[in-house]
Amino acid sequence: MKRQKRDRLERAHSKGYQAGILGHPKDYCPYKTTVESRSQWLGGWREAMEDRAVTA
């Protein structure tokens, strides 16, 4: 049985979080055209920046 792909918005959030943890700027966002995906990516990025501030 094939595994189902994860939801695209969930994946965008996850990728944004990973980019934030690595310290990439928010201009690093690959989602320039789709507003929903960009919003999710930025949400993950912001969450990561908060987590970095707490642990730093």
From Swiss-Prot:
It is found in: Cytoplasm. Transmembrane segments: none annotated. Keywords: Cytoplasm, Translation regulation. Its main location: cytoplasm. InterPro entries: Ribosome_modulation_factor, RMF_sf. It comes from the Bacteria. It holds the Pfam family RMF. One of its GO terms (cellular component) is cytoplasm. One of its GO terms (biological process) is regulation of translation. Gene3D superfamilies: ribosome modulation factor like domain. Belongs to the ribosome modulation factor family. During stationary phase, converts 70S ribosomes to an inactive dimeric form (100S ribosomes). This is Ribosome modulation factor. It comes from Serratia proteamaculans (strain 568). The gene is rmf.
